[in-house]
Amino acid sequence: MSFSVDVLANIAIELQRGIGHQDRFQRLITTLRQVLECDASALLRYDSRQFIPLAIDGLAKDVLGRRFALEGHPRLEAIARAGDVVRFPADSELPDPYDGLIPGQESLKVHACVGLPLFAGQNLIGALTLDGMQPDQFDVFSDEELRLIAALAAGALSNALLIEQLESQNMLPGDAAPFEAVKQTQMIGLSPGMTQLKKEIEIVAASDLNVLISGETGTGKELVAKAIHEASPRAVNPLVYLNCAALPESVAESELFGHVKGAFTGAISNRSGKFEMADNGTLFLDEIGELSLALQAKLLRVLQYGDIQRVGDDRSLRVDVRVLAATNRDLREEVLAGRFRADLFHRLSVFPLSVPPLRERGDDVILLAGYFCEQCRLRQGLSRVVLSAGARNLLQHYSFPGNVRELEHAIHRAVVLARATRSGDEVILEAQHFAFPEVTLPPPEVAAVPVVKQNLREATEAFQRETIRQALAQNHHNWAACARMLETDVANLHRLAKRLGLKD
């Protein structure tokens, strides 16, 4: 099999049909998997010596949440170092990053792998990976044909990153600096709530407005603050953190505004406060609702006039600080109850942001679980950490009152328990490794099978044939989508369909 002009044109057309970058990336990966008849494909973005998945097909959903650091993945490091197509032999000693992450093939290791580094000029911006369960799966494709695919993918990714850079810097195309991948705090999640939050972060980051970030404990409010700072014009200056809930009343004013020598017992020298440290940068005040009313009044003055006074000093100091505040309380209710100043609330909430709880984020829980699994793999020196189907089902049906923080701790604990029950450096997390309160899981759906006079083989094939027909109908005869619904490999599905007479 080889590429024709029609095949390449079809890939290019699919890229143009996409609505937005993410849709184009997914169309590219899905089309490539169909054309190459491979078992899995992925588009990865390169940033700070790690590959970040942008789109996948044929891989477990949690792969989208993983961050593949080069030092922990020698195959990906080889792709990053190469300037051309990389083919890994079936007996390669380098472990494949996707071993155990192809649904329905968890117990098998990937046999065939091709890596295509993607460049914008001389800069590495990403990679395409193609994987198959057959050792000779990609032998029929020449390096030149694969280079054409890489060029199409590199063009799509390069354009997306350049547009992202221009938008983040509020520049016109003619003002663009030399291409450089935009570095931002990674906020993992594709749910509607997180997608909207990311858009709002992009909007407010370019301004100098104060921001009030609200959300339940453990939702990631500090990560939102970091994302705002890193995407703002103040990113070259410090982001200073202060947890207001951990401040004893006796030292709170000094922590915020500093003090001079002799201002109080123990003040043996002059000391800068958080506002001075954050001058020309950003100050993140976590748990702002815990500040006393007296301190709220002094904070309000800083926001109004831009100057501070160290404790024990009559002189004022000018500061240029952007304030980001976070709370897990309803500050409107706190204002009505007299525990929070209304004028300070309005000063802080010029641009309010709300971080959704994990229970409202759908499949984001699986992406985040993948991220934490990869963290555990690196920290504990394991070759792989994967979630079983039962574990994924459990995570999707647990409410996580502690939100993302609870999920992180649950994954770390589960890895420790799983390691204790099996030898070796490969860990599979099962449902029993999670110590959640009782979770009611939906019963598996079992299709009714009519009673017919058939032997077991004929009945099995009839059931398979009807199941595939229904899945195809529900997915508009898209074989890749059908395979995902049936949780099987698309190449295996094609072979089964041919055997059952559903495909020529």
Swiss-Prot record:
Q: Which residues carry this modification: 4-aspartylphosphate?
A: 57
Alphabetical list of CDD domains matching this protein? AAA
Q: Keyword set for this entry?
A: ATP-binding, DNA-binding, Nucleotide-binding, Phosphoprotein, Transcription, Transcription regulation
Pathway where it operates:
Nitrogen metabolism; nitric oxide reduction
Q: Which SMART domains match?
A: AAA, GAF
Q: Report which superkingdom the organism of origin falls in.
A: Bacteria
InterPro entries per UniProt: AAA+_ATPase, GAF, GAF-like_dom_sf, Homeodomain-like_sf, NorR, P-loop_NTPase, Sigma_54_int, Sigma_54_int_dom_ATP-bd_1
Q: Does the keyword Disulfide bond apply?
A: no
A Pfam family hit: Sigma54_activat
Q: Which residues form the Sigma-54 factor interaction domain?
A: 187-416
DNA-binding region listed in the record:
479-498
A molecular-function term among this protein's GO annotations: ATP hydrolysis activity
Tell me which residues bind ATP. Answer: 215-222, 278-287
User: Which Gene Ontology BP annotations are present?
Assistant: phosphorelay signal transduction system
What NCBIfam families does its record include? Answer: PRK05022.1
According to its UniProt entry, the function of this protein is described as: Required for the expression of anaerobic nitric oxide (NO) reductase, acts as a transcriptional activator for at least the norVW operon. Activation also requires sigma-54.
Q: What is this protein called?
A: Anaerobic nitric oxide reductase transcription regulator NorR
Organism expressing this protein natively: Escherichia coli O157:H7
Q: What is the primary gene name for this protein?
A: norR
